[in-house]
């Protein structure tokens, strides 16, 4: 399993990672960004790791873009010409305009805007900017890690941090980074795309941005310091033990001291539920999830996540309103909240026959629009070995799904759950299947139209299946007769006709089948009562997939029976 070079966490199957260095040239823009902002250097032959997880890279990329925008603003300020103040505009009030603090101001390259700050607070401009760094200007939000999740108005937060002096009705105060307060210069504004540039008393320009409608931001409220309740909660659910040796500590401070003494080359951590926890706040968050499994839950869709970082990434992708998404696709008009999400989406518009990046590990030779898309595919599909069920031989990559699958072979699942909708007669295996089933009903009434043929589908999953089956160029060819199929399972069932080995067995009688559809038809026709009872009450699977060893044993048993019959007949 790969680990992220920054957070040193294992990269799970559901989490994407990015190669820091190019495989061929050994060069990387990612490494340059990391070298600029971190105290350690990542080398092409790094012994720890050569990949960075998508969560870490998203945060680093956003900060780097913010850093570049501030650097550009300071360069503009240092090179601006001097203007004179218009005395008629000194006492003019602007009720709908607010001078934004520098740490939340976004500067675009095409806007000639200057920020009015104290020269003593200027950044060090001795470092040259790379051409790539000067291309991006993006808004950022501050994130406080490991907190309770809630949504608040971004402007409320700004009003608390930057309060106006109530005793002064005419002059506004600006708080500089050094903590000093000074009056704001007001002058005749000049219109720009993003706002208004006002000329101050000393001829310096400053950016005045009109406050738009309040935006919902993903905010995490800071939790109080560790208390006895948190310590008791952690002791109740988490064992403070060293995974590298036999050692138990009272708390995480004891683990830190132990690692410092016995494992100085390792970063202190504990392990619980298969996850490495290397910070006290992560341990606290994990303990709260033991106490309340829905502690980290999306308030928009109800989906539950393992940690707050993944929840934040989910919210940015799925729940940011379109009017608050600043990056729009030129081909389809879809909007995104982050530039990297837009770049990831653009690959979907590249025709399949023009995709030049071929996965070297795929037997299907899947093609991708960019190298980044291919690396994401490799990270999710090929870097983690699939789990193979020792009972039926099924391959399952997700660990939780695999463990649930194995348990069903030896344990009886709960009773079937009926869909709560009055117009649906479906019975589902468990709560997870019910949640997935309810998404197919499309209560919102959205239209899912195929862009290729105009067919209307009930939900997004049906649309994806339609495109994959009807408009995909991927085919599966039988090596013995040359017949082609659209689905992998269709080829597998076809090959059973060549080999003579059955794939399925009826759960109600000894009959076997090569096709799942034939077995399903057999159950409804020959066992209607058993089938109806199973749909509503019976536990377990509605079919039996035969492993190859069991099939071979069946053929040996048939051969033995035939031999005995021949002996008696002779």
Swiss-Prot record:
Highest classification ranks of the organism: Eukaryota, Metazoa, Ecdysozoa, Arthropoda, Hexapoda
SUPFAM superfamilies on file: beta-beta-alpha zinc fingers, Glucocorticoid receptor-like (DNA-binding domain)
Gene Ontology CC terms: nucleus
GO molecular function, one term: zinc ion binding
Compositional bias of kind Basic and acidic residues: 132-145
Zinc finger (C2H2-type): 240-263, 296-318, 327-349, 387-409, 417-441, 448-471, 476-498, 504-527
Localisation: Nucleus
Regions of compositional bias (Basic residues) in chain numbering: 178-194
Species assigned in the record: Drosophila melanogaster (Fruit fly)
Subunit-level organization: Homodimer; at the zf-AD.
Entry superkingdom: Eukaryota
Gene: grau
PROSITE patterns xrefs: ZAD (PS51915), ZINC_FINGER_C2H2_1 (PS00028), ZINC_FINGER_C2H2_2 (PS50157)
Keyword Transcription attributed: yes
Start and end residues of each ZAD domain: 2-80
Keywords attached to this entry: Activator, DNA-binding, Meiosis, Metal-binding, Nucleus, Repeat, Transcription, Transcription regulation, Zinc, Zinc-finger
Record-given protein name: Transcription factor grauzone
């Amino acid at each position: 399993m790969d680990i992220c070079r920054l957070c040193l966490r294992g990269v799970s199957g559901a989490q994407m990672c990015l190669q820091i260095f190019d495989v061929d040239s050994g060069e990387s823009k990612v490494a340059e960004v990391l070298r600029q902002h971190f105290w350690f250097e990542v080398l092409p032959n790094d012994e720890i790791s050569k990949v960075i997880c998508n969560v870490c890279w998203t945060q680093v990329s956003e900060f780097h873009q913010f850093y570049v925008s501030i650097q550009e603003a300071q360069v503009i300020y240092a090179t601006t010409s001097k203007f004179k103040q218009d005395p008629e505009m000194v006492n003019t009030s602007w009720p709908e305009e607010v001078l934004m603090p520098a740490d939340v101001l976004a500067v675009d390259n095409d806007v000639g805007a200057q920020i009015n700050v104290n020269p003593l607070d200027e950044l060090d401009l001795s470092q040259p900017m790379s051409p790539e760094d000067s291309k991006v200007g993006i808004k950022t939000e501050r994130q406080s890690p490991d907190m309770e999740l809630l949504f608040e108005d971004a402007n409320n937060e700004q009003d608390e941090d930057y309060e106006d002096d109530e005793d002064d009705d005419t002059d506004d105060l600006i708080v500089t980074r050094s903590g000093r307060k000074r009056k704001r210069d007001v002058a005749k504004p000049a219109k720009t795309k993003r706002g208004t540039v006002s000329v101050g008393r000393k001829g310096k320009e400053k950016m005045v941005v009109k406050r738009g409608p309040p935006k919902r931001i993903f905010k995490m409220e800071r939790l109080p310091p560790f208390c006895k309740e948190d310590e008791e909660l952690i002791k109740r659910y988490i064992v403070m033990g060293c995974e590298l040796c036999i050692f138990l500590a009272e708390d995480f401070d004891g683990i830190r001291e132990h690692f410092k003494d016995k494992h100085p080359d390792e970063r202190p951590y504990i392990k619980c539920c298969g996850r490495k926890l290397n910070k006290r706040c992560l341990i606290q968050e994990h303990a709260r999830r033991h106490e309340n499994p829905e502690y980290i839950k999306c308030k928009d869709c109800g989906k539950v996540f393992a940690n707050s970082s993944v929840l934040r990434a989910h919210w940015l992708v799925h729940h940011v309103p379109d009017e608050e998404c600043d990056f729009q696709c030129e081909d389809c008009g879809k909007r995104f909240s982050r530039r990297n999400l837009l770049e990831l989406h653009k690959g979907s518009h590249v025709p399949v026959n023009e995709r030049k990046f071929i996965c070297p590990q795929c037997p299907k030779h899947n093609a991708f629009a960019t190298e980044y898309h291919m690396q994401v595919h490799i990270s999710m599909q090929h870097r983690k070995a699939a789990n193979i069920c020792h009972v039926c031989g099924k391959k399952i990559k997700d660990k939780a799904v695999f463990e649930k699958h194995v348990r069903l072979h030896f344990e009886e699942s709960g009773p079937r759950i009926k869909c709560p909708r009055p117009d649906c007669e479906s019975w589902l295996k468990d709560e997870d299947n019910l949640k997935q089933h309810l998404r197919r009903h499309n209560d919102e009434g959205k239209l899912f139209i195929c862009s290729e043929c105009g067919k209307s589908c009930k939900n997004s999953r049906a649309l994806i299946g339609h495109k994959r089956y009807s408009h995909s160029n991927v085919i599966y060819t039988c090596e013995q007769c040359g017949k082609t199929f659209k689905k992998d399972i269709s080829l597998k069932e076809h090959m059973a006709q060549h080999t003579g080995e059955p794939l399925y067995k009826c759960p109600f009688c000894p009959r076997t089948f090569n096709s799942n559809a034939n077995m399903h038809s057999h159950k409804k026709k020959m066992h209607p009562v058993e089938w109806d009872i199973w749909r509503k009450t019976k536990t377990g699977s509605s079919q039996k997939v035969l492993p190859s060893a069991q099939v071979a044993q069946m053929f040996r048993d048939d051969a033995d029976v035939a031999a005995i019959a021949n002996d008696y007949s002779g």
